[in-house]
Amino acid sequence: MENSYSVSLDRRNLLKHAGAAGLSIAAGSFMAAGLAEAQFNPPLRGRFAPGGSYILGQPGYRIPDQVDLGGGFMQRLEFYDRNERPFVMSDYRGKVTLVQFWHTNCHGCQAEVPALDKLAGRLEGSKFELLPIALSMDSQADIDRFYQRKGIKHLEVMRDRTSFVFSALAPRHPRLDAQATPTTILVGPDGNALGAYVGVAGWDQPDGVALLNHYIARA
């Protein structure tokens, strides 16, 4: 649904907020599905079909735990649980992980977060993790109210307190050329990016579930 995208941070604000590194990490790390289909051979149908909004990870691109901001300064890509404990993506190695960047005022997130909650109830286990990460505009209380209103039962509460993780990792929409929410990134058990979708993907629908199960079966 093209009208479900919520453009969260424009290029100027990203540069001010995260520095040039925030725009460069994901650049070139994802590619159109048609270019990589033969290398990965996943079931790409419906919204995940070549030529659409689903983009595959470049072979060997591992989601980083930190980025180089220049001058020898490394910035950790940390997000936090409700107890303010920091996490990085390598903490989820060993599982297929579906990361969702979202916020409570995002139009598309109103439907996708509850759908992913139900999906987590169906698929989460020793080989699969669903990881929602809310952006900095939401407080803990905002997320709790959203979860209560939407009846969220299975998803953890994670926050990207400065939206730096989002700005560093989220790809730009292949046609709109902007970062937006919701964005989902599918990560393999080795930490490599398998693919990403900017917008409401429909991971809970048959085509999305088939793609997830393809990787879960190989984890």
Predicted region positions:
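Structural microenvironment flanking redox-active thiols in thiol-disulfide oxidoreductases
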Residues: 111-152, 164-171
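Alpha/beta-hydrolase fold active-site loops
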Residues: 96-97, 182
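Thiol/disulfide oxidoreductase modules built on the thioredoxin-like
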Residues: 152, 162-211
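N-proximal helix/coil linker or "cap" segments that precede and/or mark the start of modular domains
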Residues: 39-76
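N-terminal secretory signal peptides
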Residues: 1-13, 20-29, 36-37
